[in-house]
Amino acid sequence: MSVTRRTLLAAGTGTGIAIAFTGALGALFAGSSHAAPPRQGYGPLLPDPRKLLDLPAGFRYRVLSRAGDPLRSGEGTVPANCDGMAAFDAGSGRVRLVRNHENRTTAALRVPAVDGLTYDPHALGGCTLLDLDPSGSVTAERVALAGTAVNCAGGRTPWNTWLSCEETEDRAGTSGYTEDHGYVFEVDPADPRRSGAVPLTAMGRFAHEAVAVDPYRGTVYETEDAFIEPFGLFYRFLPAQPLRGPGSLRAGGTLHALRVPGVPDLSVVQEPGAEFPVEWVPVPDPSAAGTPIRFQDFGPGGITHAQKLEGCYWGDGGVHFVSSYARTLEGAAADHHGQVWFHDPVRSTIRLDVLFGPAADIQLPGDSPDNICLAPDGGLMVCEDGGGAQYVFGVTPGGEVYAMARNAEDIGRPGAPEWGEFAGVTFSPDGRTMYVNAYTPGTTFAVTGPWR
């Protein structure tokens, strides 16, 4: 394996960690053990006296919102389970955040069922909006979408709307629901009532995680988060009409699933830099009326599955997407603690860019990547959802992994500390502020400092 900054750091602690980088994330730092390592991120994380968020020197955070606090709109309380998120330019230096709430039927703090914004009054998930003034202070907070279920991640569109993803396949009549679930919903942050609560049914009914839109061709890429066999699929949606703004995805289109010939399970790929041609196979029944999509018959060539497909983000002329982990004990073909893939739509290939091997130390950054976004330096910023310590970590264009933030709020029991996952990492339009959620207890942070 090529020498990387991560393996050099591991060597100093006696921990064996298999990780490597290649491709769009830049040249490998490769050489002998005497080679001078590159600068690592922004430096070590400093303990937070408030025990909320550990950051490097020079960075500071502001708590924007916490679950259970009153919504400024008076519509109820801030919902629980803060997840995927995006930041939009609201003009005159203002920022508008759209934030998912991954609420199941057991959620203690539902998204209030506001008239005109509610799909299924018996579903507790949805989205909220936060308006920030030029100083970064919250001036408004209100419901943008309600009556949806398990709103996990999503993705922004080139026309500045948010696609919110339901990570469930529950049908009407299940768990008290009165509507089918497992859809993508479009939220217009400029006017949520204009987008309403309309499922984009042609984009498929499955356990959606995230989406990314090709701004040049209009193709929408989608990940499916399934941790039980058969695992999830990576999809593309070809809109029936050119995408011209909010609501245009309602015109329908064609859904395909990724096939990598000869690779039925992406976990078997353990060599960063490995590249494969891909095929796109029409999904027999996108509505999953009788059979979930991942169980459907894709013909003699089959289809390619991956355990826990998570974050998905457009950048570098293609789509970065994540497999959070793979476990042979759960049916995967091989073990890993995270993969980051890159799909090049022009060359019609996928390439493994980052691999966190099965020996990854759960107390170090790089265990079970989840939500991702592009960082100001052109690399990736990644949320963890693993065991042990929970980090937001960066992957630089030069291939370094570095800790950017660590969750310092202990939500465990006495003698059994536990830290909640991070979710929804995104940056302000000017790249000067990072926004991120601590999923539990449900805190939204704004992080400022010497970004580069």
PLM regions and their residue ranges:
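Residue-level detector of Asp-centered blade-edge/turn motifs that repeat once per structural unit
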Residues: 89-92, 157-158, 215-216, 314-316, ...
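Beta-propeller blade signature
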Residues: 124-132, 179-190, 235-239, 338-344, ...
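Conserved blade-ending motifs and adjacent loop-strand segments that build the rim/top face
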Residues: 356-370, 400-427
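Blade-level signature of beta-propeller repeat domains, shared across WD40, Kelch, NHL, RCC1
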Residues: 426-452
